[in-house]
Amino acid sequence: MGNECVLVTGSGGLIGSEVCLHFYRAGYSVLGLDNNQRAVFFGPEGDTSWSLRRLRRDIPGYEHSETDIRDREGVLRLVESARPKVIVHTAAQPSHDRAAQIPFDDFDTNAVGTLNLLEAARRWAPESPFIHMSTNKVYGDRPNKLAMVEQETRWDYANPEYRRGIAESFAIDQSLHSLFGASKVAADVMVQEYGRYFGMPTCALRGGCLTGPNHSGVELHGFLSYLVRCNVTGREYKVFGYKGKQVRDNIHSEDVARFMLAFVQKPRCGEVYNLGGGKENSCSILEAFALAAEASGREQVWTYLEENRIGDHICYYSDLTKMKTHYPGWGISKSLKQTIAEIAASWSSRPVSTA
């Protein structure tokens, strides 16, 4: 690989594959790392081998490694050999529901795997920007302690202090995270520490709902993609608590990749950013049902379960002020309505089961 190599972990996933394509178009050679653990975690519905085939088709010279990020020596060898100019770390065990069933796998993947990559970068690529895809789950259920106002189709923050959403200064400890959230906190803090302690150009992106037409959404992960998938295929969607009024902000994978490239062009050490669609691209589940029906022409089939998921947010959307201040050339380019239309078109053209 050349000096302009970008190493992308989780390259078969939604964000990883988008980053591979975006950086290739920006002139980088691409080394992807992915052993299709989504198929292990979620079964055939989570399989991303189709995405890898797409990368090999669309990126001339694409190179791929199936190294497991839990394999410390394998990761060290890979980074030593490649000496990437940029490292984008999107690989993860992404489900907070499943983490409780596989706690060792979850922590080894999310926390230890991130440490393996950070140490490999410190040894062999210390000046290369290191971008870690974190999660808003690092805030645990603390956002639920904020005063809320119930509206017709959604919950929202009652305090005008949060009119733009949750900022990076919001506390991340002394709350219920789920085991997934806790393992991601460990990774998030370690990414910051390598940046601040060793002076490395690192950032952790605390993602809201990351989505797009290439997302292999399943019930345990990928809220908007899975919701639209259910709409398109006529599958029943289960709503867990909060009257279906729980709110998420949604960001298209292209806008995620655009921000990552902006960071690479002007890196900082040990930064964190809340990366989401902001209030303008937020929706409740009930509102998402209406948008999906508008995009597909089909009514949503759904059922309601009173018990909410452990640690689930009642309302969460990202305050994008810090991101836009540090990187004023970046902004949301894909509206929620446009994103849902793209997801609906994608699921309509993919061979999927209605079971």
How does the language model describe each region?
Residues 256, 260, 275, 288, ...:
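Non-catalytic, hydrophobic alpha-helical segments
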Residues 52-60, 154-170, 228-240, 266, ...:
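A short C-terminal helix-loop "cap" of Rossmann-like NAD(P)-dependent dehydrogenase/epimerase domains
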Residues 74, 116-119, 250, 255-258, ...:
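Conserved mid-core alpha-helix of short-chain dehydrogenase/reductase
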Residues 2-5, 28, 321, 334-355:
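Amphipathic terminal alpha-helices
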Residues 253, 272, 309-331:
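Conserved C-terminal active-site "lid" loop/helix of NAD(P)H-dependent oxidoreductases
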Residues 185, 198-201, 211-226, 235, ...:
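Glycine/proline-rich active-site loop of Rossmann-fold NAD(P)-dependent oxidoreductases
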Residues 242, 272-273, 286-289, 297-315:
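C-terminal "lid/loop" region of Rossmann-like NAD(P)-dependent oxidoreductases
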Residues 1-208, 346-347:
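N-terminal Rossmann-like NAD(P)+-binding domain of SDR-like oxidoreductases, especially those catalyzing
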